[in-house]
């Protein structure tokens, strides 16, 4: 007898499970269950202390502004829209001139034990808001702050709109670092020419594997919330980032591009 008849139901079953998972789902971690779930996924790949620090930042944010329609349990992910004005006024009422944390601060908090950071000179000119937040929120000690500034240093580049050339500069810079294979840093790199041509990590988050795909964790901006998004594949996550940040450019500038750890992700 042929093995095919027995195989058939499995493949259809697999397909239907797979189909269900294709659509991304997201949470703002505004519930115990979602935060615990994400925490346990992150803990498989990251230092406990890092995950604890991150969890505390999430709790502080959601306890302060969670009432502004932030989601708890994972729900189908489409374009999200947040009431930044309302969030800002709630945040400021509680925290005064500490503006909170952003994508870079949270990514460093999670990955700091997992990336070997070279002791090289950094250009932290564009990190002025981050530095103000780190200072007012007493977020990092001097060593962490120095490493943070090296990881997200501005990188010199040329006056061109050719992404390949910029990506090469970024890859060369990140060759000095050792990244983690499992807990990956996904960055959206932006070309800037206000003060000479340079590259800058305009947005960043952490991608980890799950049993049936990937989990991407990000804090959108200082004001905007945390998002944990479940994707079926890395490529889906790259696409999300490429689409969301495609307008972070200007006349004569290259379009933003994605780095996965130290490597350029060529989307073309």
Enumerate the predicted regions with their spans.
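Cysteine-nucleophile amide-bond enzymes
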Residues: 14-268
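Short, small-residue-biased leader/transition segments that mark boundaries at the very start
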Residues: 1-13
């Amino acid at each position: 007898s042929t093995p095919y008849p027995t195989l058939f139901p499995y493949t259809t079953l697999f397909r239907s499970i797979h189909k269900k998972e294709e659509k991304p789902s997201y949470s703002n971690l505004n519930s115990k269950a979602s935060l615990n779930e994400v925490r346990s996924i992150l803990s498989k790949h990251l230092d406990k202390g890092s995950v604890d620090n991150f969890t505390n930042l999430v709790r502080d944010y959601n306890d302060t502004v969670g009432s502004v329609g932030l989601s708890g349990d994972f729900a189908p992910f489409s374009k999200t829209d947040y009431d930044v004005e309302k969030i800002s006024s709630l945040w400021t009422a509680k925290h005064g001139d500490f503006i909170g944390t952003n994508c870079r601060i949270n990514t460093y908090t999670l990955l700091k034990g997992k990336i070997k950071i070279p002791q090289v000179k950094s250009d932290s000119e564009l990190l002025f808001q981050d530095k103000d937040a780190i200072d007012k929120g007493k977020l990092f000690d001097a060593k962490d702050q120095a490493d943070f500034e090296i990881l997200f240093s501005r990188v010199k580049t040329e006056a061109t709109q050719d992404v390949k050339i910029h990506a090469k500069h970024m890859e060369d810079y990140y060759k000095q670092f050792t990244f983690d294979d499992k807990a990956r840093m996904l960055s959206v790199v932006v070309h800037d020419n206000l003060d000479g041509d340079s590259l800058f990590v305009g947005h960043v988050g952490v991608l980890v594997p799950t049993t049936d795909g990937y989990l991407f964790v990000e804090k959108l901006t200082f004001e905007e919330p945390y998002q944990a998004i479940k994707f079926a594949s890395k490529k889906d996550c790259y696409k999300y980032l490429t689409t969301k940040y495609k307008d972070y450019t200007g006349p004569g500038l290259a379009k933003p591009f994605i780095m996965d750890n130290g490597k350029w992700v060529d989307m073309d």
